[in-house]
């Protein structure tokens, strides 16, 4: 929105040329989203407390979690609001990739909101029925996948980029739709599984978003894309503003979500943020790098799959409890230790993911 205003006023006031620079808008994006989150946080928490919208805690979970019962949840609303407002302010709204991320963010946020609402307001512990949750997740992902394929099929935008191999970039064809679907839905649910401790999900999300901001900038710059042997996709440069908005909103939320948490993001936040990271990975053609940078999310998801599979096949559990962060809690690790160590792992994996751009 502001970039349109700048283009209108630039002939009369040269100062407005500043608003057209991507670097300036990226910095403005992170600061705007951060300030919005910090401003909305206390007001939202107070409102959630008044409405008695508190966290539901499993009776079979770690005993340390019983004290979290009643802590305000659905705080993801402020994350999404901060991101959407910031993107509408600072991004180029003529860019279709920006709208692709916003559609997934808002759509998955709506699914998560209904799920949270049924759990904490209607007191239905099951929330949104699983098949309906996956139906709407799938529907949104497929709509976006088909739209993106129609927009960029048989171009660099539908190639598969394989880390460490600069000459391996096969054209996916219709498999692009399948890959896009699984990346968006899979990442959404992976972040949702990770969101079990104070600040555990939001900080890796911030780190991965920061990593994708760098990748989006390189992918959208013809010189750097050529130098790094990655596809040049012009529209991706504007995703830098989207990624920095996620970083700013996430850091603002962490101010209130850090241990001991004053608010939880709920499914409205985790499903939406995961879906957004998934579609960004697709747009910058780095789905495989997402597996590396989002290694904490992958680890949490695999722990659940292995736990369920082992119990059904052998009648035995591999972990004391899944997702794996609960396993370490039950081993006696204090919650802050689990959280910070997972943050460290995430930071290292994001750096490794960024290194794959050069190591080819």
UniProtKB/Swiss-Prot annotation:
Its EC number is 2.7.8.13. It is an enzyme of class 2 (transferase). It comes from the Bacteria. Keywords: Cell cycle, Cell division, Cell inner membrane, Cell membrane, Cell shape, Cell wall biogenesis/degradation, Magnesium, Membrane, Metal-binding, Peptidoglycan synthesis, Transferase, Transmembrane, Transmembrane helix. GO terms for cellular component: plasma membrane. The chain crosses the membrane at residues 21-41, 73-93, 94-114, 132-152, 168-188, 199-219, 239-259, 263-283, 288-308, 338-358. GO terms for molecular function: metal ion binding; phospho-N-acetylmuramoyl-pentapeptide-transferase activity; UDP-N-acetylmuramoyl-L-alanyl-D-glutamyl-meso-2,6-diaminopimelyl-D-alanyl-D-alanine:undecaprenyl-phosphate transferase activity. The keyword Oxidoreductase does not apply. It catalyses: UDP-N-acetyl-alpha-D-muramoyl-L-alanyl-gamma-D-glutamyl-meso-2,6-diaminopimeloyl-D-alanyl-D-alanine + di-trans,octa-cis-undecaprenyl phosphate = di-trans,octa-cis-undecaprenyl diphospho-N-acetyl-alpha-D-muramoyl-L-alanyl-D-glutamyl-meso-2,6-diaminopimeloyl-D-alanyl-D-alanine + UMP. It is found in: Cell inner membrane. Its cofactor is Mg(2+). GO terms for biological process: cell division; cell wall organization; peptidoglycan biosynthetic process; regulation of cell shape. Its main location: membrane. Pathway: Cell wall biogenesis; peptidoglycan biosynthesis. Catalyzes the initial step of the lipid cycle reactions in the biosynthesis of the cell wall peptidoglycan: transfers peptidoglycan precursor phospho-MurNAc-pentapeptide from UDP-MurNAc-pentapeptide onto the lipid carrier undecaprenyl phosphate, yielding undecaprenyl-pyrophosphoryl-MurNAc-pentapeptide, known as lipid I. PANTHER family: PHOSPHO-N-ACETYLMURAMOYL-PENTAPEPTIDE-TRANSFERASE (PTHR22926), PHOSPHO-N-ACETYLMURAMOYL-PENTAPEPTIDE-TRANSFERASE HOMOLOG (PTHR22926:SF5). NCBIfam families: mraY. Belongs to the glycosyltransferase 4 family. MraY subfamily. This is Phospho-N-acetylmuramoyl-pentapeptide-transferase. The gene is mraY.
